Structure formats: C-alpha cells, structure tokens
Amino acid sequence: MAQRLHLLLLLFLICFVNLISFSSQQDLSFIYNGFNQDQTNLNLDGSAKFLQDGLLQLTNATTQQKGHAFFNRPFEFGSASSQSPSFSTHFVCALVPKPGVDGGHGIAFVLSSSMDLTQADPTQYLGLFNISTNGSPSSHLLAIELDTVQSAEFDDRDKNHVGIDENSLQSVESASASYYSDKEGKNKSLKLLSGDPIQVWIDYEDTLLNVTLAPLKTQKPSKPLLSITINLTAIFPDRKAFIGFSAATGSLISYQYILGWSFSRNRALLQSLDISKLPTVPRPKKPEKTSPLLIVLLIILAIIVMVVVGGFYLYRRKKYAEVREPWEKPYGPLRYSYKSLYKATRGFNKDGRLGRGGFGEVYKGTLPILGDIAVKRLSHDAEQGMKQFVAEVVTMGSLQHKNLVPLLGYCRRKGELLLVSKYMEGGSVDQYLFHGDKPPLSWSQRVSILRDIASALCYLHTGASQVVLHRDIKASNVMLNGNLQGFLGDFGMARFDDHGSNLSATAAVGTIGYMALELTSTGTSTRTDVYAFGAFMLEVTCGRRPFDPAMPVEKRHLVKWVCECWREGSLVNAVDTRLRGKFVPGEVEMVLKLGLLCTSIIPEARPNMEQVVQYINRHQRLPEFSPNTPGIGVSTPVLMGLPSLAITSSSVTSSVSGPSASPSSANNSMFISHTIIYGDGR
C-alpha cells in the first residue's frame, strides 16, 4: 500500500512539473508600445540603447557598429513529443539615413541559441555572423533581414530587400521590399531606408514561416511578402532560442530603431501594437539654410561664371572646329561628324563614361541607325603621321572576325581624334575579375572567353592580308557582349600615341606583366603577342594580375608563382578561389600549362597562335615539358625596369631615356605604350 502511494505521489509530481513547464512556455507573451517602461527583460549590447522618448536605438551615425537587443527568457519549443513550435511577432522599425549620404547596412529579427553575438562582425554581416561562422550549421541562428546594401558575395538581389537567413547570410528566400495592397489588389514597393516607420509581422506555424510588411498606418495585408517551409527544430536541436534584434553599420551608416514589439506563442493571442502610443522617429537635422544675401551673391557669381564659360566655349568651338582635309575624301563613309558624336554621347557626359585608360576616355553613345556605340577620345597635338595613322585605322576597320570588336569609323578635330566602335554591354573581363560590381565568371565562361580571344589573335597573325600585332593584350582590353562572348578590342592607337612618329619595331611597348623579355632587344613579333596571351590565360584562370607589387615577393609575379605551384604538385591551387572548386581539374591544368608554355622567356619555345588554338580547343595535346624546363616560369626582367625603359608608377620611378609609362586607371597596371604594326612580323 505504501509503495503504491509513493508511485502515485511521484506520478503527480511529474505531471505537476510538466504542467508548470508547459504553462511557462505558453506564457511567453509580451508587448512593448515603446520602451520607456519595464526594460528589465531586455538584454542590450554593442551600440544598442534605450532613448528617453521610448525608442530602442540599435545603431547610431557611427561607422563599423553593431547593436543587439534580446528578450532575456528563451522561447522554448517543448519536448520532441509535444506539438510543433509556433509563434507570432509584430514590430515596428525605422531605418533613418544621415542627410546627404547613402545609409546601411540593415536590421534583422533574430532567433538564436545564444544572446552573445559579440563575436559577429558589422557591415554586411549585420552583427549576426563573422567570416568563420557564416554558413556553419553550428551557428544555430534564424534571421529575417531588412537589408539596405547589396552584397555580391551573398547573392543579394538588390539594396532594398527582405530575406530569410538560415545559419548564413545567403538567404534561403528573399524579395525586394514591398507589401500587398488589399485595396488595389497588387504589391506596392516599400523603401526600407526612407526613415518612415515600417510594420513587420512574422508568423510561424506547422513549419510554415510567413513574413509580411506594411507602412505604419496600414492594416496587416492578407498576403505575406515571403512564405517558406522552415524546420525550426532542425536549426535548434535544443528546442529553444532567444528572440530579439540585430543591426549594423559599415562605411555606410544610418540610425536604426525599434519603436514597438509584440510577441506570442499563439498567433490568435498576439496583442496588437497601439500605433498612437509608439514614439516618434527623430530626423537628423538638415544643414542650416543659406542666408538670402549669400544666395544672391552666388547667383551673381554663377551668372558671371556662365558668361565667362559661355564665351570660352564659343571661343573653343570656333578655334577647335572639326578638321577635314582633301586626303580624307576616300574615307567619307567611315567619317562621323563631331556634332553627331557629341549628341550621341550627350556632350560626352561623365555619366556615360565607360572607362579611362592610358590613351584617353571612352564614352557610351547611341546613334539612330547603329544603336549603342563606344567613342574613344584621344588627344594629339602633332599633325605629322596623322594621314598614315588614319589610313591604318580605316584598314583596321575592314578586318572581319567574329571575336574582334568592330571598329566603325573615326572623327578628327584639331588636337583630338575620336574612334567609334561597337558598344559591348558586358564590359571588360577585368571588371569581372577585379571589381566587386560584377559576378565572378564560371570556369566554362572563362574557357570560352580564352578560346574566343585565341581565335581572334590567330586571325590577326595569320588570317589578315598583313600581319597585325596587337601588342597590348590584357583583361581590360578584352570585351564581353551580353552573352559573355569574348571580343579583342582597343587596338590601332600606336602611331597616334607616339605623336605621329614612325614606330620602331624594337620599341618596348605594352603593359607590365604582359611584356616578353625580347621586346627591348630583338623587338616585336607574333611571339610577343603569344607571351601576352599566355599571361592573360593565367590571369583569367587564377583571378590575379600578372604582376602585383602589393603581393608578397614570392607571389608578385604570376608566371613564377603558378610554376612554383606546379613544381610542388599543387597546380590546381593556383585557380581563382571564387570558383569554389567548380571546375574541371584536367582542363584547368591544360590551360595553366599552356599559359606557362606561352610565357616562356625563350621565344622559339612558345607555340604560335594556330597551335594555341589547337591546344585550347583540345584538338592537339600539349607537348611534354615540366616546371624545370628551361625558360618556363621565369619572370621577365622588363617587369623590374630595364635600362632602356623609364617606368613610372606609384612606387617605382626611373629617369632614364626610353618610352615613359604611367599607371593605367583602367586596370591599375603600369602601362608603357601600345601599338599595332602591319607588316612581316611573323
């Protein structure tokens, strides 16, 4: 009897404890209509703080900051045998930019296994992860982000989006910020970084997660912005998580606030926020108004400047009118009027500037019949050699190959030459390799581009009526169309850049890292182009410039470093890390070895472009050679500055006779000069 009594008592205690536990889980419900009362249950860190008017400020106008605010009791899901977890939350936030600057980075509602996110980074990591924890299942974190900066590394769709992040900032679901208007029956865009309060509802039930947005005084829309199935218990095996907010700034800053917050395990029991009780969002002060007297003085000064500039413009227009000479009559169909090019480029507006290089600036334009074009403006003060140069430009325009950028014509003014070519909407290869505004190229795209340029260069060497040496093959001179097909461009500038003088075949011309050793002694030939193409192959495969003075000494010369990787039996380690291992190892090894063969310092050891085309298309196998073969993997002395050159860069200057060099703003490589030569250069 006593034993049975003990068992009943034990069973009662177990049921009582479970009931208390279940009750505590059911009781996790709260509401904050502003945060000026009962702040004890909220844990803040970083830049987060409560303001006197009841606002919860997560970040201020300081760079590289992060702020967190968590409810100090965990949201517990219960045992594995209990019902599936569910919750609903409603909060109002505001992201306020500083006047005159772009704001960032964003704010997120967070479920985390820990309130301690102090090891997370600000900027694009939003105070949620760092480089080592991002993407790790051990992070145990689910976030709904309101992101105002587009980060290419996380495949963000734009700089005004909402995303659902599961242990990673690469969202499993995202959409541009908007809300469904039940009145109009369609989605309406919503600017996150407007400074206006935004309502956010997050509902989770039966593994379905819904995220809904709306302006402040709008009822909850009937359709969510995001809806996705999420297994919350898989993210949080311990079946509990802390709930709260995270926000961050980087070099872009903004004030990020939470005005009110309501949470409940049961959507039906979720208390609605009282909009009338929410604090007002402060607006940063705008600069004080300029005094009327100063405005009048500025207007008078502007009028004077306009008169002076207008007079100077008329003077310049008369003095530098378009130049036409009798010998240009045969080229009439290829001659464009300056007025048409001026209108096509909207007056060479800086907004249409595509780039700036060692020879001049390139602008995008539109002609009625041809459509989009690229116009390159070149300054030139000498008339000597102009006739021969224009003749060469026209001849270059007659070259026909599918992978050459078509040269359409020219325009000539006193002191200026304008070259018109087809516009390539894909930009240049170096923009994909070295600039964050373009997505990384896949391996198949890179190989296809290399094959395109090899075909074009083979045509210049063997397919034209005369041998054409490009002499400046590099990533910034390889253009792409909308389908990412490669086109070799930016040729025909040599004689003009040398101020009309007759070019010597022994002149050392090109860009640092692409120049063959023999340029300063025996001069140019098709094999010097082969060397530059080999450097370009390595550049595209490795995602590194052929010569980078900022790298450690052992990695400064790409040719030497790739050969060293081969010597150590790890050739594929030289591949661009942005490929993330998605490449064909055998094909990569073939391309890298071919690049090393083309950059041999022994000209006779290099293949010609016909052979290169056969090798890169896998029609022939590469000849047998090793990293210890003479001439392979040797960095050329011209990169260090030979006595016959005068190379000027931000770090090296040599005041000796020879062609001068200047840094190219197009690709930050040291450019010496650039030519095309017709004749027997095979």
From Swiss-Prot:
Keywords: ATP-binding, Cell membrane, Glycoprotein, Kinase, Lectin, Membrane, Nucleotide-binding, Plant defense, Receptor, Serine/threonine-protein kinase, Signal, Transferase, Transmembrane, Transmembrane helix. It comes from Arabidopsis thaliana. ATP binds at residues 354-362, 376. Its EC number is 2.7.11.1. Pfam families: Lectin_legB, PK_Tyr_Ser-Thr. Involved in resistance response to the pathogenic fungus Alternaria brassicicola. Coiled coil: none annotated. The gene is LECRK11. InterPro entries: ConA-like_dom_sf, Kinase-like_dom_sf, L-type_Lectin-RKs, Legume_lectin_dom, Prot_kinase_dom, Protein_kinase_ATP_BS, Ser-Thr/Tyr_kinase_cat_dom, Ser/Thr_kinase_AS. Disruption phenotype: Increased susceptibility to the fungus Alternaria brassicicola. This is Putative L-type lectin-domain containing receptor kinase I.1. GO terms for molecular function: ATP binding; carbohydrate binding; protein serine kinase activity; protein serine/threonine kinase activity. CDD domains: lectin_legume_LecRK_Arcelin_ConA. It is found in: Cell membrane.
